[in-house]
């Protein structure tokens, strides 16, 4: 059971570094939900934080996760059991991955 926290300015204005500190404080409060790791990503009006409980993909599941171009970011809590099939479908559609899993 991981933990997710974040701030988003609905007016589109960029967040300052105080927002990162606030998200860090939010993820610190939920450390019990994910004691195995944490991460924060901030860009423009969005700051995302994650606390990780490692069950599957122990070494490569650090979050927040970005696409290979650094344009998209996601925090995710759950398991995708058909990931191999989805990966093949996405590869055939031209998607690029920066991990082997």
State each model region's role.
Residues 1-101:
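N-terminus-centric sequence/structural signature that marks the extreme N-terminus
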């Amino acid at each position: 059971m991981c933990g997710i926290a974040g701030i988003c300015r609905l007016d589109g204005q960029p967040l300052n570094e105080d927002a990162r500190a606030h998200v860090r404080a939010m993820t610190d409060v939920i450390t019990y939900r994910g004691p195995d790791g944490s991460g924060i990503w901030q860009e423009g009006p969005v700051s995302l934080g994650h606390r990780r409980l490692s069950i599957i993909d122990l070494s490569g599941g650090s979050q927040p996760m970005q696409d290979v171009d650094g344009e998209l970011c996601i925090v995710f809590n759950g398991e995708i059991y058909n990931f191999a099939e989805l990966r093949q479908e996405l590869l055939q559609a031209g998607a690029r991955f920066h991990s082997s899993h």
